[in-house]
């Protein structure tokens, strides 16, 4: 099992989002994430949480944003009950297959000023069971 964690200042993400163009939004977030951020009541906070989750996932894989991995290789989606899930694509998905690893769980939390996330990555054969 591997754990990744990240924390980010919400104002830092808000500043990047509010520069006047959508360059940052389009470079970092998938179309689904961007729509979710733009529809959210506190879009800056939501964007920071998704940023932290992406960082936590790549840290759990032990690669960070290297070896061709990009922010858009991790997409954060939400279940009907609001639970975040990570969907992999691109180079990170290939690395996961090569290493027989999968994202078992992610968790996102935030305040007005900070967003934090953790990611648990483990073998494809692993199963997460409720406690």
Curated annotation (Swiss-Prot):
It catalyses: apo-[ACP] + CoA = holo-[ACP] + adenosine 3',5'-bisphosphate + H(+). Transfers the 4'-phosphopantetheine moiety from coenzyme A to a Ser of acyl-carrier-protein. Keywords: Cytoplasm, Fatty acid biosynthesis, Fatty acid metabolism, Lipid biosynthesis, Lipid metabolism, Magnesium, Metal-binding, Transferase. It comes from Verminephrobacter eiseniae (strain EF01-2). Its main location: cytoplasm. This is Holo-[acyl-carrier-protein] synthase. It comes from the Bacteria. SUPFAM superfamilies: 4'-phosphopantetheinyl transferase. GO terms for cellular component: cytoplasm.
């Amino acid at each position: 099992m591997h754990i990744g964690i990240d924390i980010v200042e919400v104002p830092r993400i808000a500043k990047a989002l509010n520069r006047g163009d959508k360059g940052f939004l389009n470079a970092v977030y998938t179309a689904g994430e961007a729509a979710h951020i733009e529809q959210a009541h506190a879009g800056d906070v939501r964007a920071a949480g998704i940023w932290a989750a992406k960082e936590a996932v790549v840290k759990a894989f032990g690669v960070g944003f290297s070896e061709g991995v990009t922010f858009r290789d991790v997409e954060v989606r939400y279940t009907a009950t609001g639970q975040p899930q990570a969907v992999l694509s691109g180079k990170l998905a290939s690395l996961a297959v090569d290493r027989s690893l999968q994202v078992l769980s992610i968790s996102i939390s935030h305040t007005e000023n900070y967003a934090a996330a953790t990611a648990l990555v483990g073998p494809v054969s692993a199963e997460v069971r409720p406690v």
